[in-house]
């Protein structure tokens, strides 16, 4: 749970840097909905958001584990005007163009778990390593 809270705190700090003190909307994008790992990450993110206050976590993802489905979700989040996107990518390269579009619009982008190619994110957080798995 501490890793999940640290993760959301890092994303929130990125989203808050240079912005007014209003509610920060952070999208937590899973590889697919219904996966226990991502559901647990959402629980931790929601708890951390509650502790921080003025942070809204939007947990979302596709119903299938395809890059195309994830890109559709990302386009919707850009249209909503979220402040930050934290994504576990289904394809590290395919999501880069849409995430570049997000960053051009001022949205902070963090990849976690399964990374995004460097051009499509500002930081990557690896919540574990092979020795711990």
Kindly label every feature range from the protein language model.
Residues 2-7, 12, 21-133:
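A residue-level marker of the well-folded mature domains of exported/periplasmic proteins
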């Amino acid at each position: 749970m501490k890793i999940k809270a640290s993760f959301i705190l890092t994303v929130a700090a990125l989203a808050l840097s240079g912005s007014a003190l209003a509610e920060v909307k952070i999208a937590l994008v899973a590889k697919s909905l219904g996966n226990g790992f991502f559901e647990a990450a959402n629980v931790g993110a929601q708890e951390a958001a509650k502790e921080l206050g003025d942070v809204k976590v939007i947990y979302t993802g596709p119903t299938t584990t395809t890059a195309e489905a994830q890109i559709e979700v990302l386009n919707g989040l850009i249209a909503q005007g979220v402040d930050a996107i934290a994504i576990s990518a289904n394809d590290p390269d395919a999501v880069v163009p849409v995430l570049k579009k997000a960053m051009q619009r001022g949205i902070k982008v963090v990849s976690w778990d399964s990374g995004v190619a460097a051009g499509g994110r500002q930081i990557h957080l690896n919540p574990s390593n092979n020795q711990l798995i």
